[in-house]
Amino acid sequence: MTNIPKTKELFDTEHTIAKDLLLQCEYPYEAIPKIGECIRSLFKKLDDTYEKVEEDVYIAKDAKVWDGVTIVGPTIIGHKTELRPGAFIRGNVLVGDGAVIGNSTELKNCIIFDKAQLPHYNYVGDSIIGFMAHMSAGAIASNLRLDKEKISVSGVQTELTKFGVCLGDHAEVGCGAVLCPGTMIGKRTLVYPLVMVRGVLPGDKVYDGHSLKDRRPDNVSTFWH
């Protein structure tokens, strides 16, 4: 499994209250079936800066929740996070501090690290999105194979039927990109718009759908924001 990134290689776990769960998992996808249980265990650790808004749903009092947001528990929404109109939180979702979950974005069974952004028309299921990672408008993390078979990563069987993406800290995904089930993207890597990604992309790269280049100031633009 040498080409599959370990949890500590993708994520700085200081930027999520799911730290204890993730540190128990050598590979981050091992945490995906345990997200709901983790969230429920965290409820009793939340202080009075969180409000229980309904059964199994806790939202930081300084979070911004716009009208038209639907939240199903168990869910925790962190401090100064913004949930924009039409966001659909389907349960087993932990969103950290300072994150943005945008218009018509749908989340299910996810850990979203602090300051991550899923701001426009994104679907992210059975996934982990790292610190300050960003998915541009319409980028999708597909979590289920068409044939419903278990998902493998670089030939290694995960034993998971549903597994979307592990998106490393500071990684960027361009508009309209599709991340196939079981995708793992390294820290600070950039994915061009309209690209399909499958498997593992290492950190500090730029992927245009055909080739990987080292991330340098002269080959990085901001057109996917």
Give the label of every model feature segment.
Residues 1-56, 61, 188, 194, ...:
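Terminal amphipathic alpha-helical/low-complexity segments used for targeting or macromolecular assembly
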Residues 1-5, 41-46, 60-62, 90-99, ...:
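Phosphate-binding glycine-rich loops and adjacent basic patches that engage nucleotide phosphates
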Residues 2-7, 53-54, 70-72, 82-83, ...:
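Short, flexible segments with low predicted structural confidence
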Residues 13, 31, 75, 81-83, ...:
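Functionally constrained cores in energy, signaling, and assembly domains
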Residues 18-20, 112, 119-225:
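Glycine-rich hexapeptide-repeat left-handed beta-helix
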Residues 49, 67, 118-119, 157:
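Short loop/turn motifs at secondary-structure junctions and domain boundaries
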